Amino acid sequence: MKLGLSKALLIFFWIVGLSFFSCKKSNELHPVKLVGQAFGTEFHITYYDTDQRDLTKQVDSLFYLINKSLSTYLPTSDISKINKGDTSIFVDAYFKEVFQKSEKVYNETNGIFDPTIDVLVNAWGFGPQNPLVRPDSLKIKELLTLVGFDKVQLTNGKIIKTNNSIYLGFNAIAKGYAVDVVARFLESKNIMNYLVEIGGEIRARGNNQTRKSPWKMGIEEPNFDGTRSLKKIIELKDEAIATSGNYRKFKIDSISGKKYAHILNTKTGYPSQNSLLSVSVIAKLDCADVDAYATALMAMPLEEAKFFLDKHQELKGFLIYSNNDGNVETFATSNF
């Protein structure tokens, strides 16, 4: 009997031991990395998951739905149909949220951030493959009558425009919003340590479990020659960051040799002329929000951008600009 009892106890402790190590193993976080193309750029997603789930198909499905709603490069998307004058479209939840976020930043920046400016962006030839075009002053004046997000309303699920020729484009916020959609999806799967990056717009939560430290990323030097180097390394602690700059997206007049930035002044219709080279915004907000703020700040004069950041303490800002002597300087908010 004693031998039988001892054997039974051994079996019991062996089973308990197996269960312990099995549980320990199942709670271990493993890194998963997804890399691909979306929205005309690359995306990089890193997350830690006990089951090492490959969520590529689900993420691709989310990108498909966002494109179907918001891509001006897709002729069959809801926004493309609306831009062509189709008034029968009931917009989806993605469209509604981006519209509402855009409206908020439009009002806060007194129209400097404006999704209706794309009619002029297109006129200047700032599309991906288009050559630079210099529209004359009369053409710019004519197109400016179509600019103003207050001329567009979201009513009962439909977009109402005061002029059917008004052209909507959410490119300045869409990548950041796509980052948010993926981040929310990961959280719905109980994944709480991740970094999602699409075209330089980033949202992070938790930590880099491999290094046992906060997520880190770099802010680039504004190099016009195409080379890439880092100006500053920062940590993200449950935050999002977006950077807007004129050192990559610009076109050169073949006759005068003058550089034209892709960010337009929504009041004049001409490319913004200021000393800013790069604006990075960090906040415990959605990536779509900081994406829109970074775009707006990049279109402001330097002192106006500083003033705006001072008024919005929820935002951390890092500005890279050219001083009067042509030398590169930086400005960081006190909370950066």
Regions found by a protein language model. Name each.
Residues 2-8, 20-336:
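Mature catalytic core of soluble alpha/beta enzymes
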Residues 8-16:
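Sec-dependent N-terminal signal peptides
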